[in-house]
Amino acid sequence: MLTDAGYRVETYLFNPTMRLSDDCELNKQRLLHMEKIEFTEVVDDFVPPELEERDVVIDGLFGSGLNRPLTGGFAAMVRYINQSDATVVAIDIPSGLFGEDNRKNDPDAIIHADLTLTFGFPKLAFLLPENAEFVGEWKVLDILLHPEIIASTPTQFTLVTEEDIAAVFPVSYTHLRAHET
């Protein structure tokens, strides 16, 4: 954990409805029992900490199921983070970004991540050039999805990688650029 590596960790749980999913409640209870982590549950007014260039914000405000633009305090929080000089790491998907079509989204209410760590597969939104400013660099974390689950999941998309291209066109890069010398 970050605290074991000597980092100071502050965690904020935004809970204006005072209702949490079972998973969220379980994780809240875990955090409450961790001595080295400062935990704040925000249910009313919130005065955000001052963010500096040396800070890292780990964005887990909203996940991949979001289907409407952020508004109110959540949009204000996103704008505050985006205006800071802190490094931003988004978990799964930058908060405020829809997983696919963002044409009806509010770009001012989407986290601008420096790095996005996503699970299993990249979201379609990561591959669209208009979302690069929100996603930043992205990495897929293997969560050991069963191959049968992957094969049985319907999709109309196929991700073509450099390895796929190299298998079809096994010409080396130097041969492709030979005309430039």
What are these regions (language model features)?
Residues 54-177:
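YjeF_N-associated NAD(P)HX repair module
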Residues 1-56, 67-72:
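A cross-family phosphate/adenosyl-ligand binding-site feature
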